[in-house]
Amino acid sequence: MKNLLDLSYDELVSEITSLGLERYRADQILDWVFDKKVNNFDEMTNLSKQHRALLKEHFTIPFLKLLEKRVSKIDGTTKFLWELEDGNTIESVMIFHPGRITACISTQVGCPVGCTFCATGMSGFVRNLTTGEIVSQILSMEKEEGKKIGNVVYMGMGEPLLNYENTIKSIRILNHKKMGNIGIRRITISTVGIPEKIIQLADEGLDVKLALSLHAPTNFKRDQLVPLNRKYSVEEILNAIKVYQMKTGKRVTIEYVLIRGVNDEISDAKKLAEILKGLKVFVNLIPVNPTVAGLSKPSRQRILAFKRILLENGIEAEIRQEKGSDIEAACGQLRLKRKVSSP
């Protein structure tokens, strides 16, 4: 049987009509799934019993199994631990802002990148998520909380561009007006920098936002923080960003986790401003969050000095206010909390 959440709109219409159902039945099914959060064909009462029985023979609509939910006492940020059908686990986060709700979703079980300041990488890599598993995080959170998600950031567990096809397909599903109906400009992909995939993304015709997790201005320092940098250098990544901007004209957010004594020197700030010169970027400075790595954030004075250097050199920058750090839901804190099975 096929997972209905793996299917694009056109694929679903094709599947439905091949079973002898009218085309408009696809819209009825999607209304039940995406609007009403119903994943049981028996509850789809505007379909005949015969049609429901037929659909059950061919499709499943698996929402995720909730294992644990933690709510921040500081800001209401909510973290969900989900179990997948094969017993593996992932985490997703719902973040509340005035007038909007943002979901932070995962694209892989674990992560192959292994950033030294990130808890996810410490768990190792198990497998890519399917398109349906990515989409189901949104539906499962909305069903659990009874609230509509308006913004999505692909900043959870995993590197989205190393699960490229499923990530892109999930974005198209979440954006489709008869499916997720989330505005394309309200969707952000965060990447450590896979040059060929950044350029491929530019050709997709998707008006998503792109965030680059840079974290260091030199290869020497970035090699230590982001091991994948040994394969893709800072220069290669920034060249890909240049091509991306030539093709799309879009500004790119640069994410920079500040770690005391590692990448927070004034010389780091000056070098960062130098390598970003000429690019259309905005820098998010993120004081490192507590993880088992034992790294610590710089002093407030040092963070402000770092930001000031960037501003003085014409680089827009802000200090990101992290949400959910008390429940390990902030940047770099998501991880596998239970034993995982091998692929």
UniProtKB/Swiss-Prot annotation:
- Cite the EC number: 2.1.1.192
Q: Kindly state which keywords UniProt assigns to this record, in alphabetical order.
A: 4Fe-4S, Cytoplasm, Disulfide bond, Iron, Iron-sulfur, Metal-binding, Methyltransferase, rRNA processing, S-adenosyl-L-methionine, Transferase, tRNA processing
Residue ranges constituting the Radical SAM core domain according to the UniProt record? 97-326
Q: Give the InterPro entries listed for this entry.
A: Aldolase_TIM (IPR013785), Elp3/MiaA/NifB-like_rSAM (IPR006638), Methyltransferase_A (IPR040072), RlmN_N (IPR048641), RNA_MTrfase_RlmN (IPR027492), rRNA_lsu_MTrfase_RlmN/Cfr (IPR004383), rSAM (IPR007197)
Gene3D superfamilies attached to this UniProt entry: 1.10.150.530, Aldolase class I (3.20.20.70)
Q: Name one GO biological process term.
A: rRNA base methylation
Q: Does the keyword tRNA processing apply?
A: yes
This enzyme catalyses: adenosine(2503) in 23S rRNA + 2 reduced [2Fe-2S]-[ferredoxin] + 2 S-adenosyl-L-methionine = 2-methyladenosine(2503) in 23S rRNA + 5'-deoxyadenosine + L-methionine + 2 oxidized [2Fe-2S]-[ferredoxin] + S-adenosyl-L-homocysteine; adenosine(37) in tRNA + 2 reduced [2Fe-2S]-[ferredoxin] + 2 S-adenosyl-L-methionine = 2-methyladenosine(37) in tRNA + 5'-deoxyadenosine + L-methionine + 2 oxidized [2Fe-2S]-[ferredoxin] + S-adenosyl-L-homocysteine
Cofactor requirement: [4Fe-4S] cluster
Any GO molecular function: tRNA (adenine(37)-C2)-methyltransferase activity
The UniProt entry annotates the active site at E91 (proton acceptor), C331 (s-methylcysteine intermediate)
Q: List the disulfide bonds.
A: C104-C331
Q: Does the keyword rRNA processing apply?
A: yes
| Subcellular compartments | Cytoplasm
**Which positions bind [4Fe-4S] cluster?**
C111, C115, C118
* GO CC terms: cytoplasm
Report the family membership. Belongs to the radical SAM superfamily. RlmN family.
Task: Please give the function described in this protein's UniProt entry.
Answer: Specifically methylates position 2 of adenine 2503 in 23S rRNA and position 2 of adenine 37 in tRNAs.
Q: What is this protein called?
A: Probable dual-specificity RNA methyltransferase RlmN
Q: Which organism is it from?
A: Thermotoga neapolitana (strain ATCC 49049 / DSM 4359 / NBRC 107923 / NS-E)
* Taxonomic path: Bacteria, Thermotogati, Thermotogota, Thermotogae, Thermotogales
